[in-house]
Amino acid sequence: MSRIKLIVGLANPGAEYAATRHNAGAWYADLLAERHNQSLKEESKFFGFTARLNLGGEDVRLLVPTTFMNLSGKAVAAMATFYRIPAEEILVAHDELDLPPGVAKFKQGGGHGGHNGLKDIISRLGNNQNFHRLRIGIGHPGDRQKVVGFVLGKPQAAEQRLIDDAVDEAVRCTEVWMKEDRLKAMNRLHSFKAG
């Protein structure tokens, strides 16, 4: 059984970014904390907001970096080093252009796919790509030139509902993973249809 000791929700800091697509990872982390009656509190030595959860009998740290997205690895590496958590026991939730809104998927390893948050985490973990990811679909603007504006934009209401549904199911599936097993959680999440 693959244990998870650190769950990270990627985001840009500040109210102006809170509702943007690039912050989908933080929406997941916030909901996970809320479901377990915890609130994320700022902890400067970890460059982010943190909480401690009990998931399936495991002591799990939750982290939303307050660095900008392209420096996310600074926060992840600080916490992973302090608690001696190997890459294989880290789950990073992030927005995913290659999946449509309403879809979320677990994945282990692989490259960064152009995602600056993942790029920095891989680099700061010593080029270790073996951490788990939760890819939260936000869709693609269709034109590479429009990607930056798209990820820093806010979803339309219908899109937001689909993303929220997928995030909600991802939280439930994270609990299935921790209480039962990863494969069962993956199968359930990957067959989920929002809407």
From Swiss-Prot:
The record marks 95 as: Stabilizes the basic form of H active site to accept a proton. It catalyses: an N-acyl-L-alpha-aminoacyl-tRNA + H2O = an N-acyl-L-amino acid + a tRNA + H(+). TRNA binds at residues 17, 68, 70, 116. The record marks 12 as: Discriminates between blocked and unblocked aminoacyl-tRNA. One of its GO terms (molecular function) is tRNA binding. It comes from the Bacteria. GO terms for biological process: protein quality control for misfolded or incompletely synthesized proteins; rescue of stalled ribosome. It is found in: Cytoplasm. The active site is at residue 22. One of its GO terms (cellular component) is cytoplasm. It holds the Pfam family Pept_tRNA_hydro. Keywords: Cytoplasm, Hydrolase, RNA-binding, tRNA-binding. Its EC number is 3.1.1.29. CDD domains: PTH. Belongs to the PTH family. Monomer. Hydrolyzes ribosome-free peptidyl-tRNAs (with 1 or more amino acids incorporated), which drop off the ribosome during protein synthesis, or as a result of ribosome stalling. This is Peptidyl-tRNA hydrolase. The lineage of its organism: Bacteria, Pseudomonadati, Pseudomonadota, Gammaproteobacteria, Enterobacterales.
